[in-house]
Swiss-Prot record:
HAMAP family: TFE_arch. Disulfide bonds: none annotated. Residues 10-130 form the HTH TFE/IIEalpha-type domain. Keywords: DNA-binding, Transcription, Transcription regulation. GO terms for molecular function: DNA binding. This is Transcription factor E. The gene is tfe. One of its GO terms (biological process) is transcription initiation at RNA polymerase II promoter. It comes from Methanocorpusculum labreanum (strain ATCC 43576 / DSM 4855 / Z). The winged helix domain is involved in binding to DNA in the preinitiation complex. Belongs to the TFE family. InterPro entries: TF_E_archaea, TFE, TFIIE/TFIIEa_HTH, TFIIE_asu, TFIIEa/SarR/Rpc3_HTH_dom, WH-like_DNA-bd_sf, WH_DNA-bd_sf, Znf_TFIIB. Monomer. Interaction with RNA polymerase subunits RpoF and RpoE is necessary for Tfe stimulatory transcription activity. Able to interact with Tbp and RNA polymerase in the absence of DNA promoter. Interacts both with the preinitiation and elongation complexes. It holds the Pfam family TFIIE_alpha.
Length: 211
């Protein structure tokens, strides 16, 4: 399915990733957009409207006959998503753009030949979630590996007074004096940091191998 599932929301890694990406309101938007009861209620309200045009009535009659899965996975404009979910339009747009930037939503543009107006029809792509998480983890693992190489390739010196840590080469340029306070720099043993980095990188690599 392209919409979000309860199984995905119950996955701690997916939940935390989405929470960081779109926030609590964005998560609520995803829940409601994926909940067929919201879609059914919205369609019923549209059909009961006395101001509904004939063309729109035909469209919503067709919508009412859709299966639950087809109804929640249908393309919607941002205005329709706001109506359907009851969430502020600006918040809907902000969430959609964030999802789009991370390949978790996509849109299709249609043009009104009479007015020239463009309408963007949006579709959730939560079926991309595993791929997105894997890519994010690969990027994070790459950065971590780079940090590990840097730490292993350098000796470090630290100022006990203000906490500045610098490399051996940089410390030589200041005659092993702190560039801020002048205190003599002392050798900093980063073996514990290197060990922690190796363990974290190994865990990430195991997770990637099993993804």
């Amino acid at each position: 399915m392209t919409v979000i599932t309860e199984e995905q929301l119950g996955n701690p890694a997916i939940y935390q990733y989405l929470l960081k990406l779109v926030g609590e309101e964005g998560l609520e938007l995803l829940r409601r957009w994926s909940d067929v009861s919201y879609a059914r209620r919205w369609v019923e309200e549209k059909l009961s409207s006395e101001d509904l045009k004939a063309a729109d009535k035909a469209r919503f009659l067709a919508e009412s006959r859709r299966s639950d899965e087809d109804l929640v996975e249908a393309e919607r404009s941002d205005e329709e998503i706001a109506e359907l979910t009851g969430i502020n339009l600006n918040s809907v747009r902000h969430t959609l753009y964030n999802l789009y930037e991370h390949r978790l939503a996509e849109y299709r543009r249609i043009k009104n030949n009479e007015t020239g107006w463009l309408t963007y029809l949006w579709l959730m792509r939560m079926d991309h979630m595993n791929m997105v998480l894997r890519n994010e983890m690969e990027v994070a693992a790459g950065k971590l590996a780079g940090r590990l190489r840097y730490d292993e390739a350098n000796d470090f010196y630290q100022c006990k007074n203000c906490g500045i840590t610098t490399t051996f080469n940089n410390a030589m340029t200041t005659n092993f004096s702190c560039p801020q306070c002048g205190t003599m720099l002392v050798h900093f043993d980063d073996e514990l940091i290197i060990t922690a980095l190796k363990k974290r990188l190994a865990k990430m690599q195991t997770a990637l191998d099993n993804a």
